[in-house]
Amino acid sequence: MTVENAPQRETHAFQAEINQLLSLVINSLYSHKEIFLRELVSNASDALDKLRFRAITEPELLADEPALELRLIPDEAKGTLTIEDTGIGMSHDELVKNLGTIAHSGSREFIEALAQKGQQKDMQLIGQFGVGFYSAYLVADRVEVVSRAAGQGQSAWRWTSEAKGSFTVEPAERAARGTSITLHLKEDQKEFLGEWRLRSLITQYSDYVGHPIKLQVSKTTGTGDEAKTETSLEVVNKASALWQRSKSEITDEQYQEFYKHLTHDWEAPLAWTHFKADGNTQFTGLLFVPKQPPFDLDAQQQRGVRLFVKRVFIMDRCEELVPQWLRFVRGVIDSDDLPLNVSRELLQDSQVVRAIRKHVVKKSVDLLEKLAKDKPDDYLTFWKAFGTVLKEGLATEAEQKDKLGGLLRYESSREEGLTSLADYVGRMKEGQEAIYYVYGESRKAVADSPHLEALKQRGFEVLYMTDPVDEWAAQGLREFQGKPLVSALQADLKLQSTDEQKKEQEQHAEGLKTLTSKMKDVLQESVREVRVSDRLTDSPVCLVVPEGGSPAYLERLLQQRGRGAGMPRVKRILEVNPKHPVIEHLKAVHDRDPAAAQVAEWIELLHDQALLTEGSTIADPNRFARRMTGLLTQVAALAAAPAPAQTPASATAS
């Protein structure tokens, strides 16, 4: 298609989220305007990477322009700065889609939440969302993009906008594939036309970009009438992959800037590891642990670890290299042993990839262990951001479960704050044989649970597991440093008892045998068993989970998420406290008249109380309320009854 017979200029409205994002960018990042260059150079570098990858199987794409490079062209006379690449380019539809809409799911909710943060602005979140191209409006009041897509003939398109709610797209001319972004700089931003200003920014932010960045410079030779000004392009970056350099040559600042280039994050990473694997499988890796989670950590399009083969970019998110439970890790892997035309199918079946994956997992876990040991405060920052994701590894990565167990952090009954399992084991009481935990919705919900009464009485610390994934994590770990993990909600607490305590327990069980049998008959549709408890000291009853059963909170969670439809509800065990006044009174009433209506009423009332205590709902709230009202009425009547008259003899005695 030629310019003459192409459609005329089109005007499009920005997607609503784009308008909001532009406003956020312009008003939030005004003190960091220079980052526009890093963002645009990073995007241009991505376009070059994509072209180089396609050219492996389509070498004809390089025919009209073999060079893969970026160019910065300042024009002081026009007040413009052009960032140009010879990369993959964009078609008409891609220009409209990529520069006029946001493809992220949940984008509207994210931007609205971001806007509500006021002056705090959370720069790193804005960056993670992919400001990229729109950062140009920090320094420009008008932006023109001319692009020609590789392999789609000679059609080129011009996209233009002043960021006032709309943009235009029209036919244009461009000699070869690639994209040029021309910024019409604001009057107070002309500093970005200066050669040394541009050089310093490239050195600071983009020195490690793996393609040459050429800056157009002007030099004047001669004097007077013989003076002549010539322009030329000079390479201003090292144009070598940072991960291929020796660690001793790279500063912390360079690692941090490379991470920002790679991820578009605004904050430096918490930690990183740079390694080279030799032997049967040769590859280089550079992995980073971010400080904050991206808003779409679980989204399929989220970037993870980039795969390169012999310094050629292959793909952004190589799932085969990094397991799901390490999806927060960012970085690059560069292999010498994979073919350049590697496919997804080959990756899935490759022994090389399996070897790389194993090494990546080990290096990632080692990095977290080092962070936890050397910088515990930074590790807590990591844990609060990614702890839930890391726990998933306990259910899937058997080889790493001991190391992952050492990385867990939980609140506990001992103190505020988080504790490690190693510290917990170090504080265990004499005679304590297990690591105890309780699973529930929040610290507040579990701290006063009746299930903890016997443990607290013995001085045993209890871990509070309040994350939905914790139950699976605990089942995957099972033990730590030889100590089994035991849920306080389980039927068997593995409490050590003296012979005297065992004898007393047997006597209580025998004494309540007829009552517990009656309770089982009344509650046969609701509970598996009724038995005397050795865990209750203050509460009359509680429900415990039989072996193989799931806690009530987990059942509720699965139901809420629509995953519990086919899961049978496991009947729990009702435990009774033989020393509680309510149980003693119920036994007395039952012994006098097992068929008394009050017996069944109290049994059902106690069961409802146990359900409420564990956070479950009761089947008939109205009936429960009537029972409670009846019970309170009886108490009130007893309180209002006149005291029995004293006889003279009793009065004298008193």
UniProtKB/Swiss-Prot annotation:
Record-level Gene Ontology MF annotations: ATP binding; ATP hydrolysis activity; ATP-dependent protein folding chaperone; unfolded protein binding
InterPro entries membership: HATPase_C_sf, Heat_shock_protein_90_CS, HSP90_C, Hsp90_fam, Hsp90_N, Ribosomal_Su5_D2-typ_SF
Entry keyword annotation includes Zinc-finger: no
Pfam families registered for this protein in UniProt: HATPase_c_3 (PF13589), HSP90 (PF00183)
Segments for region (A): 1-344
High-level lineage: Bacteria, Pseudomonadati, Myxococcota, Myxococcia, Myxococcales
Compartments (UniProt record): Cytoplasm
SUPFAM superfamilies per UniProt: ATPase domain of HSP90 chaperone/DNA topoisomerase II/histidine kinase, HSP90 C-terminal domain, Ribosomal protein S5 domain 2-like
Organism: Myxococcus xanthus (strain DK1622)
NCBIfam families named among the record's database cross-references: PRK05218.1
Protein encoded by which gene: htpG
Region listing for B, in residue ranges: 345-556
Keywords attached to this entry: ATP-binding, Chaperone, Cytoplasm, Nucleotide-binding, Stress response
Protein name: Chaperone protein HtpG
